[in-house]
Amino acid sequence: MTRISLTRYLVEEQRKHNTIQPELRLLIEVVARACKAISNSVNKGALAGVLGSAGTGNVQGETQQKLDVIANEVLLDANEWGGHLAAMASEEMESFYEIPNRYPKGEYLLMFDPLDGSSNIDVNVSIGTIFSVLHMPKPGQTVTEADFLQPGTHQVAAGYAVYGPQTTLVLTVGNGVHVFTLDREAGSFVLTQSDVQIPEDTKEFAINMSNMRHWAPPVRKYIDECLAGDEGPRGKNFNMRWIASMVADVHRILTRGGIFMYPWDKREPEKAGKLRLMYEANPMAMLIEQAGGAATNGHIRILDVQPEKLHQRVSVILGSKNEVERVTRYHHEAAGQQG
């Protein structure tokens, strides 16, 4: 059986669909190489002295782990000189990073969470990198934050790498979701699954149950029904899964179905949610929809949310289509009753 590398897949997709421009193909390959380098650092762990806190905080007010900083620098260094990008934005940086004048500038914008789930680093649980690619609205002109503030429907590519028992790259360029596994001996990502599809129904949900008392009534209603099992209104038993790493939880859902929820809660009512729209929710929503699932903030499709700032937060409900639609319907019903 012929093994298909990431490069070959991208070239053949361009021939079939004419949707992957050469600059985009090269950009995706550079991001993949950066993910390989991050994977190597993650795998070395304590042997390389990269575990533990970096002693600094990021723009989100979160404590940075050493690997957060390393992963961010790897992605910046790998992508700044190739001529594919106009600018980059990261969870770990307050402002965007414009490509220095000493390098040619391209027509794309790259956003990323360099190391999602970093609270799991020291306990050796799967973590990952999430990325999103947009067109630069005004190629050749000075980049502003407004150039990044495009709805998720404008993404030209999205994906993530999960660093677990294997290093896996999951990618969409708008023609379905495809999975690549890192062959460490060959040093390349190899296509191992094509056209991933999420079952429309599920018996698994992923949510942090310790926050239940803080949720809005529609979310509590849905979870109460799941917990009631086959004796409740759903007529079936559900299992709960929660890894506290969005990459790992979403990867499980892409693999076997389920629903992932990180909803608004009343502890910080002024915030729409916890997860970041631009480089967490949007790329994951694109992947989920391309695999036949759904992704909303409880009210509207995540990909339709118009960003207002770079580090905007959003409530996230994504996964198996029928389950996501049920939770969204509960939100609409509650809003109608309040109105």
UniProtKB/Swiss-Prot annotation:
Mg(2+) 1 binds at E91, D113, L115. One of its GO terms (molecular function) is fructose 1,6-bisphosphate 1-phosphatase activity. InterPro entries: FBPase_C_dom, FBPase_class-1, FBPase_N, FBPtase. One of its GO terms (biological process) is fructose metabolic process. Its EC number is 3.1.3.11. Pathway: Carbohydrate biosynthesis; gluconeogenesis. Binds 2 magnesium ions per subunit. Keywords: Carbohydrate metabolism, Cytoplasm, Hydrolase, Magnesium, Metal-binding. It catalyses: beta-D-fructose 1,6-bisphosphate + H2O = beta-D-fructose 6-phosphate + phosphate. It comes from the Bacteria. The keyword Hydrolase applies. It is found in: Cytoplasm. One of its GO terms (cellular component) is cytosol. Mg(2+) 2 binds at D113, D116, E280. It is an enzyme of class 3 (hydrolase). Substrate binds at D116, G117, S118, S119, N208, K274. Its main location: cytoplasm. Its cofactor is Mg(2+). The keyword Phosphoprotein does not apply. Homotetramer. PANTHER family: FRUCTOSE-1,6-BISPHOSPHATASE-RELATED, SEDOHEPTULOSE-1,7-BISPHOSPHATASE, CHLOROPLASTIC. Belongs to the FBPase class 1 family. This is Fructose-1,6-bisphosphatase class 1. The gene is fbp.
